[in-house]
Each structure stands twice: as C-alpha cells, then as structure tokens.
Amino acid sequence: MDAIRIERLSKTFPNGRKGLEDIDLAIAPGEMVALIGASGSGKSTLLRQIASFSSSDARPSRIDIFGRSIQRDGRIARDVRRMRRDIGFVFQQFNLVNRLSVETNVLIGALARVPMWRRLAGRFSRADRALAAQALGEVGIAEHARERAANLSGGQQQRAALARALVQRARIILADEPIASLDPAASRRVMEMLRALNANHRLTVLVSLHQIDVALRFCPRVVALRAGRIVYDGPSAALTRERLHALYGDDAHLPFAVGDEVRPAAREAAGEPARRAPTAFDSAGSPDLPDSQPASPRRMLAASSMR
C-alpha cells in the first residue's frame, strides 16, 4: 500500500491558469522525496492538494492516503479532518502561534486526537506533555519549551513544527519549502532533522525545495515539476545536467558550481560511500538567525484548526 497515491490529478485556478495537469505519483511508506521546480511550477499546489486544502478539477482523479481516498473526482472526502491526522504540514512561513509557548505550540499537534471537551478547555494530559517534551528533545530545542514561540529563530521554529508533527503522530510530513527563509546553518539543521525523522520514525517525507543541491544531498528520490506537469521522477543520481537545464535554464549549473558530486543520498541508497563536493552548507558555522518575516498568529491558528 502506498503512503500517497495520485492519479490523473489536475488543478485549474479561478483565473483559468493551470496549476497542475495530469499528475500521477506514488510514494511508498518511509520514502523521503524532494519536489523541485521553478517558481510557479506547481510544487506548493501539489502539496496542498495532497492535504486537500482545496479541491481539484471536477474530472476523474483521486488522491489516496494509505489506501483511503482523501479526494476523488474533485470532491474532498467527508472525513478529511480525520484523515489529516496522518499528515503533518510544515509551511514556508513558520506555522507557530507567537504568543503561545513553544510547548503549547507543539501540544497543538495532539488536539485532533483528544476528546472534544479537552480541545475546548485546552487541557492536555500528563502523557501529552511527556510526549511533547520527548519530541522537543528529539529536535534539539527542549530548553526552549517554556519560551514564547516568537523568541525562537527561524530554524528553531521549523524544528518546533516538526516536533508538533511527532506529537500529532503524523505518518506523512509535507514540507513546503521549509528552508526558503533560513540561513545555511539553520537550513542544514532542518534538513538533517527531516532526514532523521524519516529514518528513525519511518515517516514518509515529501519536501519541496528551491535549492537543487540540497535536494540531491538529502533525498534519494526527486520529482521535478514544470508548468504543472511532472517532467522527472527518479533517483537523484540520475538527475543530469541536461534535465536540470530543461527545468532551470541557464541557472541549472548553479548547484554544481563547486563540483559535480552532490548526491550522497543517492549513493547511500545504493550502498556506496557518500562522497560529495563541499556545498554552501559546509562553510556555514553561524547560529540560527531570526527570520525577517515573523509568523502570522491568525494564519497559524487557522492552520492548526484544519488538523
């Protein structure tokens, strides 16, 4: 059974622009897959369709999560909220509520699995709090549990979002450009944490990335989009310069500026040593820096209510 299965998915926006066209995609449980493509290629649209934040075109299509249909023929399943319990979504803009503590933000992940009276009262059990403490420790920010989320750096906020997915007991993590607003050191930590959660918890990870070198470094499989269509789906090691040029034009050489060997994830998957040339990550020694775009509490509260 696939963790995610998509068949013949298309999405047209109200202005008539095609966001996605005839997408077929299957991701096995425990895979870590990078979703790449130029701006406007459909990466974010595809992730939001998988979570069924909006409906697809009204034509024969389906999106299944662990064998259950979350969306079919342009209609979202009635029990979509229940099905979203299995999906942890990490947004580009940090999806925490700034005025709440880090611990409380992480505990929000438990809301979908607790009785209604506890949701309304905002009361969490001792077991919930123990799980939150364990999750915060796993992502390396346990010492910040009592602080307001607004005090965290950008990278720390993304790690808190991953801790919330653990408390949620999500089986899939959809990460929409989670490192786009981070400095290189913070980006590396977030990607290493995603890889650790994938390996240690067998979580299925689908992460959209603008940085091709990061995708090749951390993800054994790459899915590339162009103009809403899948133009490549396969091992990162087989993503050639020619294919990259078709996706990125004259900028396709940038990930290979310091050398060609930036594919350790693919080498490890094949049982080979993970040799690679240095990337921008390797010279980054600075601590996490606060992001210049703080989270919006209204947006994050809305996001948490959708789980």
UniProtKB/Swiss-Prot annotation:
The complex is composed of two ATP-binding proteins (PhnC), two transmembrane proteins (PhnE) and a solute-binding protein (PhnD). GO terms for molecular function: ABC-type phosphonate transporter activity; ATP binding; ATP hydrolysis activity. Its EC number is 7.3.2.2. Residues 264-307 are annotated as: Disordered. Part of the ABC transporter complex PhnCDE involved in phosphonates import. Responsible for energy coupling to the transport system. It comes from Burkholderia mallei (strain ATCC 23344). Pfam families: ABC_tran. It is a peripheral membrane protein. This is Phosphonates import ATP-binding protein PhnC.
